[in-house]
């Protein structure tokens, strides 16, 4: 089982990869992530980095909740507030983590 990471910022993606360990794959675009998930059914988590806009991240989480309910989506944000948490909860996001709290990621 692996974790798929989506972050448009290569440096941030590498930081996420380091925090999560060896069983990760970094994908540079939302389309690349979707293609990867279509062919890798064993992925158990997707981490969406802070450089991905919130609407796209929540759309992905909503789609995964319906099509792959066993896969958790972890949302990384530069700042987390009640609005982000409420939107993430409605979309089916498993965890919301502030970028500065990367040890809090339990993907």
Show which residues each predicted segment covers.
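C-terminal output helix
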Residues: 100-106
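Conserved phosphotransfer microenvironments
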Residues: 33, 42-64
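Alpha4-beta5-alpha5 "output face"
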Residues: 65, 86-90
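A short, hydrophobic beta-strand element within the central beta-sheet of small alpha/beta folds
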Residues: 70-80
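Conserved acidic segment of CheY-like receiver
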Residues: 1-17, 25-26, 46-47
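Short, glycine/polar-rich helix-capping loops at beta-to-alpha or helix-loop-helix junctions
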Residues: 80-86
């Amino acid at each position: 089982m692996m974790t798929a990471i989506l972050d448009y910022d290569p440096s941030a993606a590498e930081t996420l990869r380091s925090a999560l360990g060896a069983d990760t794959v970094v994908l540079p675009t939302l389309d690349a992530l979707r293609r990867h998930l279509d062919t890798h059914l064993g992925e158990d988590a997707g981490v969406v980095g802070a450089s991905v806009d919130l609407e796209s991240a929540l759309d992905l989480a909503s789609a995964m909740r319906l099509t792959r309910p066993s896969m958790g989506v972890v949302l990384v944000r530069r700042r987390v507030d009640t609005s982000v948490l409420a939107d993430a909860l409605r979309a089916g996001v498993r965890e919301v983590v502030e970028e500065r709290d990367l040890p809090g990621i339990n993907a």
